[in-house]
Amino acid sequence: NNKAGKKTHPQTVEMTPESRIIVISGPNAGGKSITLKTVGLLQLMLQSGLPVPVNERSRMCFFDSILSDIGDNQSIENHLSTYSFRLKQMQYFLKKCSKQTLFLIDEFGTGSDPELGGALSETFLEVFYSREAFGIITCLRKGNWLGFSNN
């Protein structure tokens, strides 16, 4: 970026056994999805044996599985609305999720009625948390998930 005259915006993301799940909330166009995708890309690069452009003091680990739900994946051919697709994704996540899992979910709870979406999201989050999985979730608002939050 320096050679191209562009500014680099470093990000700090820290997950520990005590703080395994990060919820990034904020307005549209605030950088939530970019942060989520950056973490996912860097993790895939590491696990593929590629050099990872991070600070020399950074520490990363390997996961047995990386699960992602990023983007609107509705399908006319498969008769799936955004809501139906998301439920199928979460069903798959629940089957695969363990303490060796990194999950990345963009706009958690969207595609449904806000009240129902919030309740379902909270239920899925409880399972991910109980299985000691690591993850990052983006959303427009945190909803009732603050009980899982350290701060």
Language model: regions and residue ranges:
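ATPase nucleotide-binding head domains, primarily ABC-like/P-loop NTPase cores
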Residues: N1-N151
